[in-house]
Design a protein with these regions (language model features):
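Conserved SAM-binding strand-loop segment of SAM-dependent methyltransferases
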Residues: 54-61
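Conserved beta-strand elements of the Class I
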Residues: 12-14
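Class I S-adenosyl-L-methionine
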Residues: 5, 64-74, 82-198
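Short alpha-helix immediately C-terminal to the canonical SAM-binding loop
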Residues: 42-46
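A short, Lys/Arg-enriched amphipathic alpha-helix followed by its capping loop at the start of a domain
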Residues: 26-33, 51
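Class I SAM-dependent methyltransferase "Motif I" SAM/SAH-binding loop
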Residues: 17-18
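Glycine-rich SAM-binding Motif I of class I
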Residues: 21, 25
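Conserved acidic E/D residue at the C-terminus of a beta-strand in Rossmann-like folds
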Residues: 38-41, 119-120
Length: 198
């Protein structure tokens, strides 16, 4: 578990491609302090600011942000998946959205967190006959991290939705990490909605 790796009372996080803050909310619930969220979409930014007015949200193109000098224990982000998904024609790095992976990588290189977490669609593993995943691993490992990935399904972790995602974890060399174990019982949609008034 990540919490066991970080020896800080309240580990700090910088989240890239934050969307409406799903990952940040989960980390906040786990005791992490969000230092910065970067998001380009104005509607997502408005949602973030409405739901968490105290969060530091940067409404900017990630290309414009200089991460040098920034500090955080963890960097997270779901770099845009459309370039790797079935719906997005699977063009990979040939699609400009696919090249945003390199901006995630640049942030990791400049911030030098103890850990980074990235997520993407399962199809990224097969994109361009496996060349895409090799590039991703080579780039991230070149910064001195042990990098691993695993396909996790949200339904196995207390979410009432079957949603498979590749979760990349990078840790400083020598740090042990273990993915969380599956929960024994899945939550159904009716379980999730049981307290919602009619």
């Amino acid at each position: 578990m990540i919490e066991n790796i970080l020896n800080a009372k309240k580990p700090t996080v910088i989240e890239l491609f934050a969307g409406t803050g799903g990952m940040a909310l989960g980390l906040e619930k786990a005791g992490f302090e969000t230092k910065l969220l970067v998001e380009y979409d104005k509607d997502c930014v408005a949602t973030l600011q409405k739901n968490r007015p105290k969060w530091n949200v940067s409404h900017d193109d990630i290309h414009n942000i200089n991460f040098k000098g920034m500090k955080a224990d963890v960097v997270t982000g779901g770099f845009p998946c459309q370039a790797f998904s079935h719906a997005g024609n699977k063009l990979g790095f040939e699609d400009t959205r696919g090249t945003l992976f390199y901006e995630f990588a640049r942030a990791v290189k400049e911030i030098k967190p103890k850990i980074f977490v990235a997520e993407n669609v399962e199809a990224i593993l097969r994109n361009q006959d496996g060349k895409t995943i090799k590039v991703i691993m080579d780039v991230l490992e070149s910064f001195g991290y042990d990098v691993r990935y695993e396909v996790l399904n949200a339904v196995n972790y207390g979410v009432a939705q079957k949603r498979k995602r590749v979760i990349f974890i990078g840790t400083k060399k020598g740090v042990k990490f273990q993915y969380p174990k599956h929960q024994k019982n899945s939550i159904t949609l009716s379980d999730a909605l049981k307290d919602v008034p009619d």
